[in-house]
Regions:
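"A position-specific structural signal for the A-helix of alpha-solenoid helical repeats
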Residues: 11, 49-50, 86-93
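Residue register of alpha-helical TPR repeats
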Residues: 7, 46, 82-86
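Alpha-helical junction/boundary sensor with strong preference for TPR arrays
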Residues: 35-36, 74-75, 82
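Alpha-helical linker/edge segments of TPR/alpha-solenoid repeat scaffolds
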Residues: 53-65, 89-101
């Protein structure tokens, strides 16, 4: 299970994403990568979702595709890890990115 600091960092990154502060999200997630091995399955899904959607918003399609594919895999392993709205956006974005390749 992730430590409280990792959970706090993930919540902070989520709040920054909601505020469209994408560069700040990337900074938080870069720090959170140090705790990556300790993240739980649902936290991994959220981590990769935020990483992928942030990369997408910052016009980094290769990184977005990679991270969203990892998020989709994590969400299949932990079905309740992402909200239905997040899953719908994840799969729409994956399709869009794949179509542009």
């Amino acid at each position: 299970m992730a430590c409280a600091g990792s959970q706090r960092d993930l919540r902070a990154a989520t709040a920054l994403y909601a505020d469209a502060r994408y560069e700040a999200v990337q900074a938080w997630l870069a720090q959170l990568r140090n705790d990556y091995p300790d993240l739980s399955g649902p936290e991994l899904a959220q981590f990769h979702y935020l990483s992928g959607m942030t990369a997408y918003r910052l016009s980094q399609p290769d990184e977005a595709l990679h991270e969203l594919a990892l998020a989709a895999h994590a969400a299949r392993e932990q079905p309740s890890a992402l909200a239905s709205e997040q899953l719908a956006l994840l799969y729409r974005t994956l399709e869009e990115l794949a179509d542009k390749r």
